């Protein structure tokens, strides 16, 4: 019964998030957290406690964002006080277009464990409630602790002390784009805008290009150009000023420039 209530709350939140004001959205978020606390359960993709490890509140906690969470506006919808988000490189993970959203009927970004791969990202400080809210946002992903040795700071001298969390899936759970679940241009815009925001804030000349280069399966054959009618729920008009730069980075190259071809080039 508790799981049904949580699922209903998440569904309502997702729908109302498009229609309500920031104040109403905050109220929805608070209600979600109350239900989680009351039920003493975690909303996880695998219904397993291992997918949502406990949070040690005696140390600082940080979330690593590598997709829409890189975008300060998108991130702020879930964690309002997360403007400070320094860039990092994360070793041992591959960023790939391979996570389907059933409600949105689209394919989003996913990080999978893969030795020998590195991707760029950001991190931001998060309270226990912030992490629970992000658990709800990333309900189909597992939250895992990333060893400090696998995180390289960029633009700042060193990493702060604490635990670093990231939302991932195993490769066996990857679901690739197709005609029914395309990549949304507006989601790619939100992701790449976050990369360019970080590039400007920390004066990193190629950070945006690195986002593209360390992301795999840019499947242009299954791509929905939805800028005239944005389909992504967390799309922000702020991305429009970055469009020319985004289009320069996401080159309209041959459809065969997919995951396999990019891997062969490594």
Model-derived features: positions:
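Ser/Thr/Pro/Gly-rich low-complexity linker/stalk segments immediately outside membranes or between
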Residues: 20-37
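A glycine-rich, hydrophobic/aromatic-adjacent loop/helix-cap motif
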Residues: 32-266
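Terminal signal-anchor or tail-anchor transmembrane helices
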Residues: 1-22
């Amino acid at each position: 019964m508790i799981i049904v209530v949580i699922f209903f709350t998440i569904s309502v939140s997702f729908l109302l998030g498009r229609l309500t004001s920031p104040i109403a959205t905050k109220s929805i978020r608070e209600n979600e957290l109350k239900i989680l606390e009351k039920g003493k359960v975690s909303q996880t993709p695998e219904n397993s406690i291992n997918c949502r490890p406990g949070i040690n509140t005696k140390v600082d906690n940080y979330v690593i964002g590598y997709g829409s969470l890189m975008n300060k506006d998108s991130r702020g919808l879930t964690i309002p006080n997360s403007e400070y988000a320094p860039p990092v490189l994360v070793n041992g993970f591959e960023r790939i277009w391979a996570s389907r959203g059933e409600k949105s009927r689209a394919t989003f970004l996913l990080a999978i464990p893969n030795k020998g791969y590195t991707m760029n990202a950001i991190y931001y400080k998060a309270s226990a409630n912030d992490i629970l809210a992000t658990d709800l946002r990333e309900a189909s992903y597992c939250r895992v602790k990333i060893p400090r040795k696998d995180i390289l700071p960029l633009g700042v001298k060193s990493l702060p002390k604490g635990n670093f969390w990231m939302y991932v899936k195993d490769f066996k759970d990857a679901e690739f784009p197709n005609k029914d679940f395309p990549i949304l241009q507006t989601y790619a815009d939100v992701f790449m805008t976050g990369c360019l925001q970080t590039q400007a804030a920390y004066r990193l000349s190629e950070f945006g290009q690195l986002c593209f280069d360390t992301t795999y399966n840019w499947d242009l054959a299954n791509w929905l150009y939805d800028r005239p009618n944005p389909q992504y729920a967390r799309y922000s008009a702020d991305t429009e000023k970055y469009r020319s730069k985004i289009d320069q980075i996401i080159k309209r190259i041959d459809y065969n420039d997919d995951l396999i071809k990019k891997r062969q080039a490594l």
